[in-house]
Structures are given as C-alpha cells and as structure tokens.
Amino acid sequence: MNILMITKEYPPHIYGGAGVHVDYLCRELERLSGAQHRLRVMCFGDQQGTGINFDVTGIAGMSELFCRKGANDKVVDVLGRNIVIAGLAEMADIVHCHTWYTFLAGCLVKQFLDIPLVITVHSLEPKRPWKREQIGTGYNVSSWLEKTAMENADGIIAVSQGMKKDILDVYQPDPEKIRVIYNGIDTVQYTKTLKPDILASYGIDPLKPYVLFVGRITRQKGIIHLVHALPYIESGVQIVLCAGAPDTEAIAHEMSVEVERARAGTSNDIIWIPEMVPVQRIVVLYSHAALFVCPSVYEPFGIINLEAMACGTPVVAAAVGGIPEVVVHGKTGSLVPFAPVSSVDPEPCRPEQYARNLAAAINELLAAPEKRQAMGAEARRRVEAHFGWEAIALQTLDYYEELRQERVHALKECRPYVDKKIPSFRA
C-alpha cells in the first residue's frame, strides 16, 4: 500500500501535540511497513529525505507570492502550500491528513487520485473561538475547511471518545465513519530520568518539591487559570512554568502581568522558563516534579499528560475532553471538575472557583507524598499497558486497509455502468 501522509508539523518543526502524534505515528508505520507499504510524508517546511520505503517532502512558505502582508497572509500561505502538495501528490492508495492546515490538500488529492481520504481530528475549530484572535477572519476559512473535510472524508479518526462526541455534536457525520484511535507515547524516551544538575541550570532547587506546567501560552491550555491558582497553593514548594510560544502579543503581555501579580501573592518561588525546552530536558523536569498540572479548558486528548505519566509523575488535570480517558481519578492523579460557559465558549463559567479548585487538588496531593508515589507508579503502568505506538500504528494500518477494501467493493458495484458500450452518434 502506498500511503500519503499530509501534515503541517513534521520534525524538526514541531510545536504541538498534533506534530508529536504525526512524528511517532510515521516512525512506527515506517518500522512496520517492511516491503508491504511505502510511506510518503508531505509537510510544511524545508524537510527533505528518502529511504527504502519512506520519503519526506517539505513545502516552503509562499504567502509573498499571493498576498500582501497582513491581509490574511498566514491563511493564504496555508492554502498555497495545500495547492502545491495536491499538485505534487502521485501514486498513493490512501491519503491521511492531520488538522485543518492540510484538509484542502487532502480533499483535492482524494479527487485527483480517486483514493480514500482519512483525516485525524486533533481538535475542532468551532471549539477554539480564541483562534480568531490569532488569525482574524482567516478563522472563517479554517472552520469552513474543517467542515468540508468532514463531509468529504471516507474515514475520520478521533483521538478520544470525547473527541468523537464533539465531532458528532458539531458536524453530525455518519457515526460509522468515525474510528477512535488514541494518541500514544514513546515509553523508552519518556521514562523516569533523574539529573539534578539540569534542574539547577534552570534555577530549580533539586531538594525542594515543585509543581510543573508544560505547554504553550494559549487560551486552550488554561495557563492563566493556573497562574491565578498559585496564591492559593500551600507554601514550601516551587512552581515551574515551562511556557513559551504565545499565540498572540496580547496573551503574552497578559501572562507577564499575571505572573508578576502571582509572585506578589505567594511566598513560593515561581520559576518561569519562557522557551520550548528540548525533549531530553523536559523528561528530566517531568521526572523530578512532585506533580504535573494540566489546566486546559479544551483538550481532545492531551499528550502532555501521557508524557508526565510515562515519567512516573501523577497528574492534576481539568476533567475536559479526552483527559478523563487518560488520567484515572484517584489512581494516576486527580481530575478537577470543569464547567464551560457554553458549548461555543470553553472558558470556565466560574473562573475564580476553577482556580481555587485547581489549587485544592494540588494541595491535597502535595500533602500526601506516599499517595503521589503510588499514583506515579500506576501512571507508568497505565501508559505501558494502553498507549504504545506499535498498537496505535497497527490499528491505523488496519483502518487504511478496511477503507481500501470498501473502495474496491464500491468500484466493483459501479463497474457494470462503466463497462457499458457508449453508443456512437456518428451517422
């Protein structure tokens, strides 16, 4: 089988959970393929590479060719790259796309090559209204592209049961088209790794417990709510915020102001690491943490929680989206109740109470070191048992083959009409 994978993010240009997913899925598909399958990855960037049954082609930016600066140039750049990808695609038996950034290319390739289209849904645009702050009226385009892909896809992969429910609520596709295949984790790379010198390089005291956050500075990740919770956390701990890549200048400024306000309201050290930390160091930060906090207001799955759990660290997380399918309350961590403003506004309806609830859950685990240790061990066991990439890649290959066979059957059903002799209109 010739598999065409289309993605915005691909190593070394990865900034979010979707990129992590694609990276590991492609690695495992390549490893499993042998001589049976060939995988071609087309992505945004300058990546180029080839192997026996694998190659990658990056498509460079091109907004300057089509659009004046500032006039939806980011979205126009996306559309331009999609057109190029569709024009270069060839010899594929199935096309698999990730996120709205590649859905136009996927829809076009499906029509050009007459092959099944699979989309993996990592999030939904209507559930992320803050994207309008980031891309302006381009948000209308991203939402339209997502809706179009839902209508055109032969198969839809949801990364959690929560994500499947959201897809059905928002777009009402045929439920039979949706397959739930979880995200996974590399349990070799993400394992407990203790290196106190790395903590010291960030100004973290290795002898003092700390609470850890890792993520981008976005509305979705809920970091502002965690910052609001910091004054309510009991004294005697450190707070480590591994937070960079702000979506907008406005949220970057808000983050700076709120962190300074939190520092004035607590005796605990707040250590803010404002850049994206390399994986090797992130693993160390997870491993030494007393607990990890995921305050997201919208999280279809939450790979970040798997990363912490794989390193043997218990998790305090909002009970949103797919998180309860990963974090088992009372076993691998604590789930904090969450109520959104509405189905189209995922912010907490009572933000002050949410912040206090986060702090209460954090304080409860900080006060119980033996319980934290047991939860961390159970978290690692759960990750090993349920979230390995080999099983996820095999499920994906099986789904590809299922869709291919459906297409073959459909073509056979149509063949009698194709084979009928077309009458001549010559005299």
Give names to the regions the model predicted.
Residues G162, G184:
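Carbohydrate-associated surface elements
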Residues P116-V118, P126-T148:
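Nucleotide-sugar donor phosphate/pyrophosphate-binding loop at the beta->alpha transition
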Residues I185, Q238-V257, I271:
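Glycosyltransferase donor-sugar binding loop
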Residues L291, P314-A317, V327, S334-L335:
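Short hydrophobic beta-strand element within catalytic cores of glycosyltransferases
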Residues M1-G49, V408-A427:
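N-terminal subdomain of nucleotide-sugar transferases
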